[in-house]
Structure formats: structure tokens, C-alpha cells
């Protein structure tokens, strides 16, 4: 009966989590490595660090510490591969803790978005169809936000007809 179309934008913002990024890396002479870090995704950290430092993922054990909140900002790596590389070179454990200033300058904020939404509904207000186009300004470092946005755009509604599209702009 009715079609409503709206456009929305969100700005890039930093998650503002409580504790800064910190890690402790230890690489032994036989190439095995241990990494303790503040993360929301130790398996992603293991895979990224192994690829960046050039070691087998099976040789890297990542232990996630308790975090006070990450809000999606602690799912990737910043200092962890550096600590691993330095530990391998020094033959000793290496600890890196970012200052609050370093966190805001050197870690990634959420990306900004431009979203167009089109919703079909009955005159009684029941939503019958929904469509969304999401454009993320990920720049040179696109992220997994596309998947999360397209999967959750209308997840709260029981709809028979849904279409979501997303791209990095």
C-alpha cells in the first residue's frame, strides 16, 4: 500500500574501548610462537599474524585476554605482528602496550556509511518488503563490515521479501 524511502549517513568514529591495545609475544628458536593480546577474535589474529610474519598458523598460539570492551575494534591486528617479529629477531619475549594517544592515532575507527532504505508496508503499518543499499568508505583497508551490515539490516523483522546490497566506496 505504501512505500517509504529514506537515506542515512553515519560518520567514521572510534570505538573508544577502555583498555589500549597490548600484547606479549614470544618466539622460540624452533619457530613456535605464543602471543597474548587484547582481542575479540584470536583465530583471526592468529591467521593474520601468521601470514604477515611468515610462520605456519599451527606454530602460533594466540591467547586472548579479558577485555573491557572492544565494540568491534579489537578484531584485527596492529601491534601483534610487530611484537612477533621483534621477538623472533631478539630471541626474547617482547611486550608492546599502546598509549591512549597512540590508540586513537594508529588504530582503525569504524567506517562511515551512506545507506538508502526502501520499505513497503500495508496501511495498517505491517512491513511487507525491505531493500537497502549500503556504501562503506573503507578506503585502502576494507573490512568485514559489509557482511555484518547486509546480514543484520532487517534481521529484527519477519519479512518475506528482502534485498540488501553493499559495497566499499
Question: Which functions belong to the PLM regions below?
Answer:
Residues 1-169:
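Structural alpha/beta core scaffold segments of enzyme domains
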